[in-house]
UniProtKB/Swiss-Prot annotation:
Protein name (record): Urease accessory protein UreE
Compartments, as annotated in UniProt: Cytoplasm
Biological process terms in GO annotation: protein folding; protein-containing complex assembly; urea metabolic process
InterPro entries attached to this UniProt entry: UreE (IPR012406), UreE_C_dom (IPR007864), UreE_N (IPR004029), UreE_N_sf (IPR036118)
Gene3D superfamilies per the UniProt record, alphabetical: Urease metallochaperone UreE, N-terminal domain, UreE, C-terminal domain
Function description: Involved in urease metallocenter assembly. Binds nickel. Probably functions as a nickel donor during metallocenter assembly.
Keywords of this entry: Chaperone, Cytoplasm, Nickel
Family the UniProt entry places it in: Belongs to the UreE family.
Superkingdom field: Bacteria
Gene Ontology cellular component annotations, sorted alphabetically: cytoplasm
Pfam families per the UniProt record, alphabetical: UreE_C
Major localisation: cytoplasm
GO molecular function annotations of the record: nickel cation binding; unfolded protein binding
Length: 148
């Protein structure tokens, strides 16, 4: 039987030496508690009270090992609109589901999430909305989805 050691993160620092890296999605970086596996296969658990993780944070484990946080690309939908009313209604509906969104001129970018699957389906059916599913770095607007 093989056992793997789970490292507990005890501190989050900046600009210190590190020996491993972990890639996290935007969503995972917002979680106060998470488990992850580093590039070298180390299992770790993070309990980041009163904050969330940022790219280039160094997670300091109980044994002093430093693990650098890197962003992974997210599965996203890009929705491009030809009119202001459809744009506003769609943004309202997504916001009403408490989902973060990235707003640009006549464009909304959202994470692929089951809670808005029906909205995305409706967007595909609407000829005035161009829908594209892709992988990219998600950068939501505002601070509505920060740690409270």
């Amino acid at each position: 039987m093989t056992f793997s050691v789970i490292k507990k993160v005890i501190e989050i620092k900046k600009d210190i030496p590190f020996s491993d890296e972990v890639e996290l999605s935007w969503f995972d970086m917002q979680k106060p508690n998470l488990t992850a596996v580093t590039k070298k296969g180390v299992n770790l658990v993070v309990k980041a009270k009163f904050t969330h993780l940022h790219e280039n944070d160094i997670l300091v484990c109980e044994d002093g090992i430093g693990i650098k946080v890197k962003r992974s690309e997210d599965e996203i939908f890009s929705l491009e609109f030809s009119d202001a009313l459809t744009f506003a209604k769609t943004a309202y509906e997504i916001g009403n589901r408490h989902q973060p969104l990235q707003i640009e001129e006549f464009k909304i970018i959202v994470l692929d999430d089951i809670s808005i699957a029906d909205i995305i389906k409706d967007c595909y059916a609407n000829e005035s909305i161009k829908v594209e599913k892709t992988k990219a770095y998600f950068k939501p607007n505002g601070k509505a989805h920060h740690s409270h």
